[in-house]
Each structure stands twice: as C-alpha cells, then as structure tokens.
C-alpha cells in the first residue's frame, strides 16, 4: 500500500518489520547504548562497500576518499545525527533496506516469536536488526542519503515514527553517503552529551578502521559556546590488525592491561592471523597472577569478541574450555553469525572450529613455556595448575 503526492510517498512497513520495531520500542535490549554501536557499525560497513566498489570505479569517491563517521547533537532540537560518507543509498535501496526484511523464510521465522522476550531475543539472533535499533532511543528517525556516483538531485529522505508506515521523498543532497537523524525520546537524552558519546565510542568503536569524530564545542570564560570543531574519538587502527613485526612487546603488554584490567604484565602471549575456511585473528594472553575468584566456576571468563574490528561482547566463553578460563585476550572474526543483540553467540561449526584452534594455541604456548622457561612455567603452575587439572 502506498499513497503518493509528487515525489513524496507514504508506504506501509512489511508486517515483519512492524513486529521488529515493536520489539525495539519495547526493548529486548537491556543495554540501550548498543544502538550507537549498530549505527556506527553500519556506517563503517558503508565505507567498506564504497572502498570495495571504488577499486573498479574511482569516480565513486567524488574527489573525496577520506572516509569517516561523524556524530553531532542538538540539545535544543533533541536530535543526534550520525553521518557517513560511504556508499549511500538510492530510492530503491532505501525501500529495500529500510522498509522490508528481504530474507527468505522471514514470515515463517516471525510466526515462531512468542511473548517471551529472552526467547525472542535469541530467536531473532538469526537477524541483523542494525538500523532498527535506532528506535530503542528515538521516537522518530529521519534518514537522508545519496548513493555514491549519483547526481545531487537524486538524494532520498526517509522518515518514520516506528509505527505502521514511513514516508519517502526525493531531495537534493550535496554530499554522498547517509545522515541518520534520531529524534530522541526521554530515555535517549543521556546521549545528547559529548562525554557520554565519547565513552560509548571508546567502548565499542575504538578499533574500527575509519575515524569516528564528534562535533565538539568549547565554552568561553562566560560559559557561552565557542566555535566548534570535529574531534576524532577513536584510534581508528586496531592493534591486532597490525603486523606482528611492527608491534613492540611494551605495546602488547599495555594492550593486555587494557583488555584484562590487570596491573601486572602477562607471562606470555600469542598473536595470530588465520586465513582459510575461517578468517580470524586471535590475540591470547596468559596472565602472571590468578584473580581472587579463579576457583569459582561462575567466574566471568572468556575472550573479548570482535567481528570485523567491531566490539561485540566481553567474556565470550564459547572460545575456551572452562579449564582454560584464565586466558585473556580477543578473537576478531570475519564470518561469525551473531544473534540480534550480539550478546549471545550462536553455537555453530564456526564457533566450534575457533574454540578448537584457540585451545590448541594456548596449550602450545604452555608446552613451549614448560620446555624453554622453567621458572616462568613454575610461576604459571602455582597460579593456574589446579584449574588446568580440571581438563
């Protein structure tokens, strides 16, 4: 169903999208800030797609190959804007990506949803909700976009209040890429704050390979706003994506403290990039000292999980057996399937394969230590021998 005046059209959402929006608005996410992770991740993907397409058509850059994500907010207007200069979307793309879920078996899948939120959140795991997570914090969302390589008058504006329909119209947009404007509801207003945004970006997007910047406004002596400027918040290069030969021991040790919140240096570590059936990088550390609750089997353990440099979760215990629960570090996979909130890993062959590889890697490190450094291995055994015996 659609109703059109000139180039403005009102279209109904596919029924499954309505269900998904209902779940977002009555949020199955305990953690509201992840909307930002999802939207920045999408912006990063749009940049990756542009980079890929520009390999065969450099004109798509339109003279600007400096890709990035920019965030700005307006407290008076109650809006947060996330902008990228990636691949952008045409009108057809917008209808396909923001009005429907174009996946086979969708209706059958949604018919299985119950009213049990925890079960639904796991079921929905076969879906990427990405963009729709904006409705966790916003009561209306406006998207302004233009596909790379298209004329400036071929921009598109999409708007929805998360109910049954959305409007779409043609606009003129000077720059390629996508602006997502969130009209924040009451519980989203905490994100209209420079320091809160920096905190979330630092937490989830530090290791995305493109700059994420915030429009920062300083105050003068009278407390009035001075001229603002774009300020890059993330590091924009993940340590584990760098070549091992370029990373100093001190950097590995510092990074260990960052991921483990430990104050001491680790005993040893292993950094590996694997390409083949599964593409992933692992950076695994063996600590020098056991935490005080080591023998508690409910002790939070596991690796940090990233997918394509985007932080997904802490304590992903699926990649280590419990007898190696002292291992710290991360795994960065290019092809893991994740559930909707990315908080529960699907138990599948990829997960099992990575678990097996990481386990072998750790046991190999310990074997090498036992052969080459008695003193270090003795330190390890005193701290973790009892746990290792569980295996």
From Swiss-Prot:
- According to its UniProt record, where is this protein located? Cytoplasm
| Swiss-Prot/TrEMBL keywords | ATP-binding, Chaperone, Cytoplasm, Nucleotide-binding, Stress response
Which coarse location class applies to the principal site listed for this UniProt protein?
A: cytoplasm
GO CC terms for this protein?
A: cytoplasm
The disulfide bonds in this chain are none
SUPFAM superfamilies the UniProt entry points to = ATPase domain of HSP90 chaperone/DNA topoisomerase II/histidine kinase, Ribosomal protein S5 domain 2-like
Q: Does the keyword Membrane apply?
A: no
Q: Which GO molecular-function terms appear in the entry?
A: ATP binding; ATP hydrolysis activity; ATP-dependent protein folding chaperone; unfolded protein binding
Going by the entry's taxonomy, the superkingdom of the source organism is recorded as Bacteria
Function text: Molecular chaperone. Has ATPase activity.
* Entry similarity comment: Belongs to the heat shock protein 90 family.
| Subunit structure comment from the entry | Homodimer.
Q: What name has this protein been given in UniProt?
A: Chaperone protein HtpG
* Gene name of this polypeptide: htpG
């Amino acid at each position: 169903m659609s109703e059109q005046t000139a180039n403005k059209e009102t279209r109904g959402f596919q029924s499954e999208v309505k269900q998904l929006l209902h779940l977002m608005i009555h949020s199955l996410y305990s953690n509201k800030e992840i909307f930002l992770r999802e939207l920045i991740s999408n912006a990063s993907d749009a940049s990756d797609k542009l980079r890929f397409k520009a390999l065969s058509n450099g004109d798509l850059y339109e003279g600007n190959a400096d890709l990035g994500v920019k965030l700005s907010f307006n407290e008076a207007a109650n809006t947060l804007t996330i902008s990228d200069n990636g691949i952008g979307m045409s009108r057809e793309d917008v209808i396909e990506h923001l009005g429907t879920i174009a996946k086979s078996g969708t209706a059958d899948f949604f018919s299985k949803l119950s009213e049990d939120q925890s079960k639904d959140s796991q079921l929905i795991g076969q879906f990427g909700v990405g963009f729709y997570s904006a409705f966790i914090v916003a009561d209306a969302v406006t998207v302004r976009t233009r596909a790379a390589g298209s004329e400036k008058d071929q921009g598109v504006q999409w708007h929805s209040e998360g109910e049954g329909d959305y409007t779409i119209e043609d606009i003129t947009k000077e720059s390629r890429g996508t602006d997502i404007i969130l009209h924040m509801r009451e519980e989203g207003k905490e994100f209209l704050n420079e320091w809160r945004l920096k905190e979330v970006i630092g937490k989830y997007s530090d290791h995305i390979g493109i700059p994420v910047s915030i429009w920062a406004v300083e105050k003068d002596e009278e407390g009035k706003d001075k001229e603002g400027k774009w300020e890059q918040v993330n590091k924009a290069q993940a340590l584990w994506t760098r070549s091992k030969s370029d990373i100093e021991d001190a950097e590995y040790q510092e990074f260990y403290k960052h991921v483990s919140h430990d104050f001491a240096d680790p005993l040893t570590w292993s950094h590996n990039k694997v390409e083949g059936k599964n593409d992933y990088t692992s950076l695994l550390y063996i600590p020098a000292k056991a935490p005080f609750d080591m023998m508690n089997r409910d002790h939070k353990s596991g690796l940090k999980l990233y997918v394509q440099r985007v932080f997904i979760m802490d304590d992903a215990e699926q990649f280590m057996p419990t007898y190696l629960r002292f291992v710290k570090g991360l795994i960065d996979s290019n092809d893991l399937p994740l559930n909707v909130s990315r908080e529960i890993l699907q138990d599948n062959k990829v997960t099992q394969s990575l678990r097996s590889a990481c386990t072998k890697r750790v046991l190999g490190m310990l074997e090498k230590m036992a052969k080459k450094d008695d003193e270090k291995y003795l330190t390890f055994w005193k701290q973790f021998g009892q746990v290792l015996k569980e295996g």
